[in-house]
Amino acid sequence: KWIISYGDQYTQTAYYICSVGNKVLLNPIGTVDWRGLAAQPYFLKDLMAKFGVKMQLVKVGKYKSAPEMYTEDKMSEPNREQVSAYINGIWDEMVKAVSESRKISTTELNRIADSGITFADSKEYLKTKMVDELVYTGDIKNRIKKQLGIKEDETINQLSVSEMLKAPAEENTADEKIAVYYAYGDIVDEVAAGFNNETCIVGSVVTKDLEELANDDDIKAVVLRVNSGGGSAYASEQMWNAVNELKKKKPVVVSMGGMAASGGYYMSCGANYIFAEPTTITGSIGIFGMIPDMSGLITDKLGVKFDEVKTN
């Protein structure tokens, strides 16, 4: 089937997706954002110091950079190294894919990104072959009708993405089924009061669910979709064990999303098979524990004093 991509403005991500179209069309006053990737972490150490707060940190692994925002005022060299490797890896994948779709060399695509084309005249996008034509929104339907071979006064049977998502899934009446289990978010031991477990991976809930899947004779295999940067080491350990127990009864396949790192990788590594995307952040680079030292705020700034009587 043919695909026509059209946009008034293409963000970099949108252009990456739409570049696979047979034709990429742009509004005559539209823009294409194509300028490379950047990472810009922020650091709270000096801000906390103004309030008399500092972090006590214990960590294993020089690349475990998550606590740096609380303990440093700039990126450590190991963190700079890994972030650079990551964003360059993603950019290389994007450039390679667009190069194949648009028949533009990777060297040229990098030159275009360096040129600041995002704010260029729209005709520049034609010249660089990033788009095929400049077309007003009102003309798109007629172009599609022409492509379909129908008259201009006839209507097109259209279906939006939101309408497609509302369509009911076909009922599976087969006796043998493959379960797809989604594990998205931060890994926690228990869901906090006032929050729901749809935005995090609750270790106790996941282990119970995996146990039920293991005991369901209609389920012949399980696909575990993981998208998590990690969290509780205890919960990760329990889920890893649950995956191993599940694997004893039926095949377990992990499909990794944008991230399956630290505890997200830990819970995955017990599976029979693991599949990741070229841009997935995965692996484990260490652990850390961190406790805020509030003495500078409470004692020095607020004047709160403590005394103690104890038995041991």
Indicate where each model-derived feature is located.
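Terminal amphipathic helices with adjacent charged low-complexity linkers/tails
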Residues: 133, 141-147
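RNase H-like polynucleotidyl transferase catalytic core
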Residues: 254-256
